[in-house]
Amino acid sequence: MKKITLLLALLAQSLFAAAQVFVEGVKLEPANTGQYIELDPLFREDGRCAFQVDYGQSNPKQDYVTDNHGKRFDFRSLVDGLNFFYEEGWEIAQISVLERGRHFMLKRRY
């Protein structure tokens, strides 16, 4: 019975665990990003999408969304990636259409 209770407690805890946004292993939080970030989506041939993120760091063109260990994270689609950022507290503030595609300026929701 204790094992079942422990298992249920661990499962319930995992439901409330939220993913966090990392760029090259650096966690994005208000102290290091401010209110805005810029996303540059990069598409693969299979339709998956990665994002380069500019949050004010010194070399933004080489910084991708990663897990906490620095491994690059690919999303199933552009919308999947934008939904991920929305769930993490960001919303689209502006969309810029450039020669090589769209750029998304995101603003912190809270």
Q: Could you tell me what each predicted segment is?
A:
Residues A12-F16:
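N-terminal signal peptide c-region/cleavage motif recognized by signal peptidases
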